[in-house]
Regions:
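Short aromatic/hydrophobic "clamp" motif used to bind/position activated sugar donors
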Residues: 80
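Short, acidic, metal-binding catalytic loop of nucleotide-sugar glycosyltransferases
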Residues: 21-30
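C-terminal, non-catalytic tails of nucleotide-sugar-dependent glycosyltransferases
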Residues: 110-113, 125-151, 155-160, 197-198, ...
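A conserved acidic beta->alpha catalytic loop
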Residues: 29, 37-46
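A short, conserved alpha-helix in the catalytic core of glycosyltransferases
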Residues: 96, 152-161, 165-170, 176-204
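Conserved donor NDP-sugar-binding/catalytic core segment of glycosyltransferases
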Residues: 91-129
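Cell-envelope/extracellular polymer assembly enzymes that use nucleotide-activated donors
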Residues: 2-4, 32, 185
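Glycine-rich, basic loop-to-helix element that forms the pyrophosphate-binding segment
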Residues: 58-75
Length: 281
């Protein structure tokens, strides 16, 4: 099964080439890889041209959301997978995804990989902090032997949805550029389209070098919490807790249900309404 991978990148060539090497080495199927290159003056643009990679381009950094939407315009498969440029995909990652996709009779699902990182992943396991000191054998052995369960309530990259669903929600909301709050907003839009399967696939593991692009660059982040609250009436934490059940430890047990109001939820709702009023002032 062919998947269209969309990958925004901003002068991060060393990590990007490492990411691409993992796809070449560890994919069972041939996939469409689409970059969106922001700036590219570090050699990324020339690298893409010389290697005949498929890409869209902007002279400056247009933000995560706009980058993803630009790249997605070129997608020609039924499934779109968004990935970071500083990830390393495990062996047979696509086989695990395809096996999962084949379980569904409709397209109302959102599937994600399991982030492994030094100290900021769903699973914390040190295999290195850069491509140069990455212990690939250690990562492979960990992926082979780990018995973690699939989890409930995912809202993070890498994530896959059907192309029709992507179009239905209009991709990523560009008012969240440069990107803070964009993932929960995307999931909220899917929720409003009756998606109730938000599932993390344990076997589909990626090693993530901790959002290197955002950390290294002097990028002024937007206030995603404020924008999300003004848009939906509650903040991303409330959405993750009561809708997605996504605290990173809930084992997947089927499609989610609409949240039922209890005393704790009601108190949080009142607090969120006060925050909403504060943001509106």
């Amino acid at each position: 099964m062919k998947i269209s991978l969309i990958v925004p990148t901003f002068n991060n060539l060393n990590y990007l080439t490492f990411f691409l090497s993992s796809l070449k080495k560890n994919s069972l199927y041939d996939h469409q890889i689409i970059l969106h290159i922001n700036d590219g003056s570090d050699g990324t643009l020339n690298f893409a041209k010389e290697n005949k990679l498929l890409f869209t381009y902007s002279r400056s950094n247009i933000g995560l959301c706009s980058s993803l939407n630009k790249a997605a315009e070129l997608a020609n498969s039924n499934y779109i997978l968004y990935a970071h440029d500083d990830m390393f995909f495990c062996k047979n990652w696509d086989l695990y995804l395809v096996n999962e996709i084949n379980k569904f009779t409709d397209n109302l699902f959102y599937l994600t990989g399991t982030n492994v990182s030094v100290n900021s992943g769903l699973i914390n396991f040190d295999c290195g902090s850069t491509p140069e000191n990455f212990d690939e054998k250690k990562f492979d052995e960990f992926c082979k032997n780990d018995l973690s369960k699939d989890l409930q309530g995912s809202h993070w990259a890498p994530h896959l949805i059907h192309k029709d669903l992507w179009k239905s929600v209009g991709g990523f909301s560009e008012e969240f550029n440069p990107g803070d709050g964009s993932d929960p907003d995307f999931c909220m839009k899917l929720w409003n389209k009756n998606v109730r399967v938000f599932k993390t696939i344990s076997k589909f593991k990626v090693y993530h070098f901790s959002s290197v692009t955002t950390r290294k660059r002097m990028i002024k982040l937007n206030n995603g919490t404020k924008r999300f609250t003004l848009k939906y009436g509650f903040n991303p934490r409330y959405f993750r807790k009561y809708y997605l059940k996504g605290d990173g430890s809930n084992v997947y047990n089927g499609p989610l249900n609409n949240p039922k109001m209890n005393f704790e939820m009601f108190l949080d709702y009142l607090i969120n309404k006060l925050k909403f009023i504060y943001y509106k002032i």
